[in-house]
Amino acid sequence: MDGESWYAKDRPPGDRVWRHLQYESYIVNEILPRLPEPPLAAGASFGALHSVLLAARHPTRISGYIALSGAFDTSKWLNGYHDDNVFYTNLVEFLPGLNDEAYLGPMRAQNPKVIATGADDPNVEDSRRVAGLLQSKGIQVGLDIWPGWAHDWPYWKDMMRRYLS
């Protein structure tokens, strides 16, 4: 999906964000209603973004998240383009101003709340930043920085095994 949205450099930035929102809408309106209970959202890299973004934008619909090596600052892929859709799909932009207890209360109740990355991962600062923003809202998210671990599937497989066990 990210190849049709965030990574689609041949498309105008506004179209990329809109495509992401279509994907999110599909999950929220077509998949989640068919589940017996709110699921755990988990993913790596852009999947980590999707996990935490769903948990923040739809906190009563997601039970918790495990986000590995997240690329959380979506502005990097939009060439300076900005509108309301960009704002509300960029965790580093909208979390600082989020003060609505209708969102924050359910976000605090989510379990687990894990953001993990490797010390050598190119997105380590994004992970630190988003975890700090969540913690500043009273959301007890675990931030794990794995020594020497980088941005790759073998590492994520080991990480996910640990967090799911």
Describe the residue ranges of each PLM region.
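Non-catalytic cap/lid and distal C-terminal segments of serine-dependent acyl enzymes
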Residues: 1-165
